[in-house]
Design a protein with these regions (language model features):
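Long, C-terminal-biased catalytic regions of enzyme "large/alpha" subunits
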Residues: 1-79
């Protein structure tokens, strides 16, 4: 399954990237894994990273709202 990046390039969907970003925001490992699994099931070939980010943020807010801003900060500051 391919993900379309902001610049139009494509890369293979990587559930571990989602899990790692959730962990970086302070979510518990089991919650991060759960979100990764849910996104793997929701994603489709050609999904854009922008849509994935919205889905991830919504899942984080439902699981642990205190981590939502940390995740946003992490996403904005990663290189």
């Amino acid at each position: 399954m391919q993900v379309v990046k902001k610049d139009g390039s494509k890369e293979e969907f990587d559930k571990q990237k989602i899990i790692n970003s959730c962990l970086s925001a302070g979510l518990a490992p089991d919650v991060a894994e759960k979100i990764g699994n849910e996104l793997e099931n929701l994603a489709y070939d050609g999904i854009e990273t922008k849509e994935l980010r919205i889905l991830i943020l919504n899942k984080i807010r439902k699981e642990d709202s205190s981590c939502a801003q940390k995740w946003i900060d992490y996403e904005q500051n990663k290189t």
